[in-house]
Swiss-Prot record:
Motif 'HIGH' region mapped to chain: 131-141
Protein name as catalogued: Arginine--tRNA ligase
Species: Nitrosomonas eutropha (strain DSM 101675 / C91 / Nm57)
PROSITE patterns, sorted: AA_TRNA_LIGASE_I
Assigned protein family: Belongs to the class-I aminoacyl-tRNA synthetase family.
Amino acid sequence: MATTIPFDFRSHCVQLLAQAVKQVLPEETEIHIELQRPKQMDHGDYSTNLAMKLAKRLRRNPLELAKVLIGALPDSPYVGKTVVAGGGFVNFFLKKTAKQQFLLTVLQAADSFGHSKLGAGKTIQIEFVSANPTGPLHVGHGRGAAFGASLANIMAAAGYAVTREFYVNDAGRQMDILALSTWLRYLDLCGIALPFPSNAYQGRYVVDMALEIHRIHGDRYAHYSDSPTQQLAEINAKAAADGEDEYLDNLITAAKSILGEDYAYLHNFVLTEQLNDCRNDLMEFGVEFENWFSEQSLFDSGMVARAVQLLDDKKLLYRQDGALWFQSTGFGDEKDRVVQRENGQYTYFASDIAYHLSKYERGFDYMLNIWGADHHGYISRVKGAIEALSLDSDKLEIALVQFAVLYRDGNKISMSTRSGEFVTLRQLRQEVGNDAARFFYVLRKSDQHLDFDLDLAKSQSNDNPVYYVQYAHARICSVLEQWGGAVDIFGRAETELLTNPAELVLLQKIIDFPDTIEAAAKEHAPHLIAFFLRELASEFHSYYNSTRFLIPDEALKIARLALISAVCQVLSKGLSLLGVTSPRKM
């Protein structure tokens, strides 16, 4: 009767070690066993420094303890031998037959191969992108989108129940600035030319929204009993005496006064236009969310007032200069923070406290915020507020994503969001394609700067990592198409014929795939999947260039085709986790 091969050899070896420790060191009831993949294949398949760690604590010789542990290891149908190496490492060597037979398990598992029960069904909310709906998404947002979407896929594959959330900043000053910017462009279309503030939104999309409003409503929002020309001219006349922010705020106040109830229409129009554009852009990029959470809803529901009241009930607020301050220095922040201004308006920080209170009250087991690196200073105050509310701050993690710098012809492309001089995510996607954008964005750790070479991303060469990986997939599909047989036969493949060193390397890479997904989930590191795919593609291309597949020896042919079919399956799964397609032809 055939033995069922476990999906996870690593876990099997960990269990063997745990049983050995229980036998020879029964007093060691709390141990953490880690296995690493040795850098050199001749050092085994897995290695652990457990004996060295235990020896240090128990004041024993690590080499002797390693030998004792090996002697206590139960027999295994999958482990060929274990040896002591170096200063006390225990190295495991899997049986060649175990690796060969594992291939059949991979093929049988199909798309579920690589999945694990790491998350055990626990819920995790991943909030990412959350860009202000004040203009098109730019390439910086694109990196956060690719990172967040890929990580969400990886966490789901690792057994977590994932909720993807976009926090819509639809309340506050930035939306007012966009509404004002659009109205001023609209007035210009109506023949009312007024100075346009340098710190208003400058992009072409503002003019486009003004044109759409004018197309629908004509001059309706230009003629009021209170003349826009007179009021705004008075504000412009003393603009030099005011600071830029005060000048802009005065214009916003005047716009609200002049437009009256019509201001709400203008505000909602620009919000809807930009939010729809954002949704469509992300959807085309393969990034979707279960929930779009409105900041304004926190005010409408009274959640902001309730969050502030909870802090007040804990006597953690005080008044100074007419404003209400949170004693955040008592919770690790560098200074106390205002939650309510002198004019009674709540600050952005107050709504952020309420938003995180909402997350906790929704009952997620874990929460992950993915923020731009420019929000680094915001972490301590948010964590402080969570602790002040007596919530478990360990449930919340915050990952930072550095900006992506674009290069064309070796030259850096300069960008400025407010002035409208930036490359949008849509422009990037149109130039290099979704696949290249998604893959390139996760080639580095999220907290590392990313240099995005547009020319490389468009090239069809082995230097282009996404092309290199996709080409491996297409090559395999081509071989299988030339063969033209039924893949069901692979389940009866004589895998013991796969003895070529290149074949054993490919088998080992396939075995590593579930471990790679788990590591990427634990470390919040999609780049580990990208690295793995490049390595697997490289090993396959070498194998392809040195091996014939459609050969007279039927048994060996089927075994080799089964192997590359499994490689194809893993490449496709890995690419899908990163939101990248797997073309059958290139």
